[in-house]
Every structure is written in C-alpha cells, then in structure tokens.
A protein has these predicted regions:
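Transmembrane beta-strands of outer-membrane beta-barrel proteins
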Residues: 43-45, 89-93, 123, 138, ...
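Outer membrane beta-barrel transmembrane domains
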Residues: 210-306
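Repeated loop/turn-to-beta-strand initiation elements of outer-membrane beta-barrel proteins
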Residues: 55-56, 86-89, 133, 192-195, ...
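Outer-membrane pore/translocation modules
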Residues: 99-216
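Transmembrane beta-strands of outer-membrane beta-barrel pores
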Residues: 49-55, 80, 95-101, 129, ...
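Residues that define the transmembrane beta-barrel architecture of outer-membrane proteins
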Residues: 41, 68-74, 116-123, 149, ...
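Residues on the lipid-exposed face of transmembrane beta-strands in outer-membrane beta-barrel proteins
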Residues: 47-49, 76-80, 123-129, 155, ...
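Surface-exposed strand-loop-strand hairpins of Gram-negative outer-membrane beta-barrel proteins
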Residues: 52-73, 110-111, 166-171
C-alpha cells in the first residue's frame, strides 16, 4: 500500500494543477500544467471567474453567425490526487454557472437572449504513465529539483446537467454528452523551463431536442502547446496556444456550413500567498478564427489546497 504522507505547508507542492481547474469553454480552452503531478493525497478547491466578450456562446457549434456575446462564468471545482497502480492519478469535478447576453443571426433573423443558470458538469480523470510515479511530498520536491519527461493520458466527460429549454436556440446547457480523450507530454528544457504539448479529440452525443429535431456534431481535434517558466516555488507563468478543427454539425437531414478551424493565444500567471492559497490570472484572444472563436477571455481564480 502507498504511504500517504502529510501535505506540507509549502504552496509549491500544491499549486501545480491550478490551471486545469479554471476553464469552461470546451475545445477552445487553454489549460497549462494539465499533466504536472501533485503528491498523493493532495486536495485542491478552486473558485473561478471568467469574462468572455465577442463571438462566443456556451455551445460554439450553434448555427448562429455574427455572434456578439457578453458572458460571465463562475465555476467551483474540486480535485484529489491519488495512487492508481503505483502511478499518479487525479480526479477533478467541476460545476459551472453562467450569466450573460448573446445576440446573433439565425437564418438571416436576429436572435438575442439573456441566459443564466447552471452549466454542464464535468468529470476529468488523468493518469501519468511515465515520469510521475505515485509520490509523497519529499518525492515531489525531488521531481521539482530535477524534472523528468512526463507522459499522461486523460478522459474528460461532460454531462448534460445544465439548464436547457427545448424551444430556445441559445441555452446554458448543451443537452448532450461529450467526452474528450487526450494524451499530453511535458519536456523539461531547463530546470525552470517546461514545454508542454497535448493532443485530444472531442466526441459529441446527439441533441435529440433541438427545436424539434435531432442535432449531430462531428468530432473536434484539438492541440495545445504551453511554454512554462517556474519563477520560484509555486510562482509560475506560461505562454499558451492551441489549434482546433472539425465539429461540423447537422440538424435533421441538413448539414451546416460551420466547420470550426481556429486557434487561440494567451498567457497565464499563478501567484501563491500565505502557504496554502493562490491566485491565478489568464488572458487569451483569438489568433486565427473561422466560424466563431473571435473572442476575448479574462480568467481569475482563487485556490485553497490541503
């Protein structure tokens, strides 16, 4: 049986998964440090806020054009690290709430709606298959001092728990199941520099109650790359970029001309304080946009770890 060592007060041991717990916008998200491990038995609670403005809706594949939105998100997340077959594994639960106004064109007609309510809940399981055996705080400090190449896999499941009205185009929830399997690699370039890469794919269930018809969506291939600078224990910053393609939808027998092919660029900073607390901030913008994705995002989060 693995030994569960007490978690030390040093926040550097507890912050490495913060960025993972703060994003709410499916394939368009930027998530640095998604596969960096924490010691066995670590718990993290995060309260996150996001502000998005521009061509964005809760479900980016909706058949809307000329979208202009102003949406605020709150998200509560809990995460625990544990040992699975002698390797580091992490389970994360997230529940978002959003409120905002969205306006766009649907078949040449302007549609606008104020929305508020709970979004779709998420569960994510990640597992490190190389470079991150289950470890106590002492082992984690050794990994920080001499980083190794880390390879991890993950599965994210998004459940149709959000508020959804069958007679509305614009909703908070998506009324369908979604899953995203992914694989990620962390390469240490120097002791304080890390290069991270992830490739994954979103797969979507059907929405059988889309204005009286069934709405289907093709998978979306997504990639992310992050350059991370560790400034001091627990204090780090990153430059983030992604690219995603696919996701064409069909409603009934009609295929939509809404293939997504876009990329985003942003930056993230995490600053610890008073031992077990931290703040996180990030900004991102559309770099190349086709069929949505041209929006600005500000994210602020508070973290408590034990």
């Amino acid at each position: 049986m693995p030994e569960y060592s007490p978690i030390p007060n040093n926040i550097s041991v507890l912050l490495s998964m913060l960025a993972l717990m703060c994003s709410t916008v499916s394939a368009q998200e930027l998530v640095p440090r998604a596969y960096w491990p924490t010691p066995n038995g670590t718990n993290i609670l995060v309260l996150g806020y996001q502000k998005t403005t521009g061509d964005i809706v809760t479900d980016p594949s909706l058949p809307l054009t000329g979208v202009d939105s102003d949406i605020d998100y709150l998200q509560l997340s809990y995460q625990r690290t544990f040992s699975l077959a002698g390797r580091t594994a992490t389970m994360q639960l997230s529940l978002p709430y959003s409120r905002g106004y969205t306006e766009g064109l649907l078949e040449g007609e302007i549609r606008g709606r104020h929305t508020s309510g709970l979004g779709d809940a998420r569960v994510r399981l990640s597992y490190n298959i190389k470079g991150a055996p289950s470890m106590d705080a002492k082992g984690f400090q050794a990994l920080r001092a001499d980083p190794k190449t880390i390879v991890g896999v993950s599965l994210l499941v998004q459940a149709p728990t959000g508020d959804y009205e069958v007679d509305k185009v614009i909703n908070v929830g998506t009324n369908r199941w979604s899953i995203k399997p992914a694989i990620g690699v962390i390469w240490p370039m120097r002791p304080t520099w890390l290069l991270e890469f992830e490739v994954g794919a979103w797969f979507f269930g059907d929405n059988g109650d889309f204005l009286g018809e069934t709405r289907e969506q093709d998978p979306i291939l997504s990639t992310e790359i992050h350059l991370v600078k560790r400034i001091r224990p627990g204090f780090w910053a990153s430059l983030d970029a992604n690219f995603y393609m696919g996701g064409r939808t069909s409603v009934g027998d009609s295929e939509q001309a809404n293939l997504q092919r876009s990329s985003r660029f942003g930056a993230t900073v995490v600053l610890p304080f008073k031992g077990r607390h931290a703040f996180r901030g990030s900004l991102s913008t559309g770099l190349v946009t086709k069929t949505g994705g041209d929006f600005e995002m500000l994210s602020l989060s508070y973290l408590y770890a034990w």
